[in-house]
Amino acid sequence: MEPLWGIFATPLLYYAPLYMSSAGLSSTQIGLLGSLFLALSFVFQALAGPVTNRFGRKRTTLWADLISWTLPMLVWAVAQSFAAFAVAAALNATNRIAGVSWSLLTIEDVRPGDRPRVFGILNLIVTTCGLLTPLVGLVIARQGITPTLRGLYFAGAIGMTVMFVWRNKITSETLSGVVARARHKELGVMQSLRHSLAEVAGMRRHPGLLGITTFYVLTIFLEQLSLFQILFLERSLRFSAQSLSYVPVAGVVVTGLLYALVLPRLAGLPVGRTLVLTRALGLIGAVALLLVPIGNLSVMLLVVSLLGGATFLTQTYREAALFARLPTAGAANLYSAVQTLALLCSVPAAALAGAVFAASPRGLFVLIAAVCTLLFGLAVWLARREGHQS
């Protein structure tokens, strides 16, 4: 089912900064939209666990997807002002509820040992949809970015809606979801929220959860800082939209190789050691991006592919590492709490990135390299701590 989401979302999210720029938004405004999205995401993330428990994983996923993707797709298709993009961002922020319910719907009934592979498959499916990006790039080269993406947004609204309804028909509620829904059935959303907060307050009781939570938060912060990568490649390194369309294709190749060759080899390693490897790759890529020669397509694709591979591995193993430390009871609340904390800490990231990029595009990517250094150090600490505990 995921390709019906990915074939639209992958190119649209990739080209979104260029689309907003073509609509007349400045880099500062784009950054503000990112922070607005994160601030509202924080609110919806706080409600994600209670809502998911109250209405069930399956039902919550359907309605949250329709609100967070179908509706904003239609708004983006006609947006011509900062206000319109802000409305779309507000609607899209509700995907934090869908993110929790869908993750639980997907993973709760899967054996812990198989979870990294499941996350890897899902990431691979979405990344593979990047193969369509050059086709979008060709249309952009002929028709322009604004009309091309407007049409794709309209098509995306239709395609995603079909997927959401279809997926809802063929999935079943998880066993944990049935239990949680029964427990929260008589509670209102606010009562359920208070119940959830009581469980979250006991986070310290779960060994290793605070450490992996810190790692999780920093990776989300880093992803928000990286929002301007495509603008950096276009403006500072002078790559055309057609050249940039090959970036997702390179990402597909790297992700496929990682999934086929690397994930099986990492399966027997402790999670902490895999996080060290992924963040070492991320640090090398972040530094290398600062050294890419202007207009050198081959070097750029190599470096961005390295960064994409590091992101793929990080997203795969950070989720697996987090779920490994979550108790069966209250998983929805604690998973939602970790993401809520990540969003809270990341709210200023997009605005900060926009301000730094406006002042010095290269300066932003020096900052990103510094965050990558911090993440690598944290991964090493987590691996050592994991070794001592074992």
Give the label of every model feature segment.
Residues 90-126:
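Cytoplasmic helix-loop-helix junction between adjacent transmembrane helices
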Residues 59-74, 273-288:
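Structural signature of the two symmetry-related core transmembrane helices
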Residues 32-50, 249-262:
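Central cavity-lining transmembrane alpha-helices of secondary-active solute carriers
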Residues 1-41, 208-248:
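Helix-loop boundary and gating motifs at the non-cytosolic
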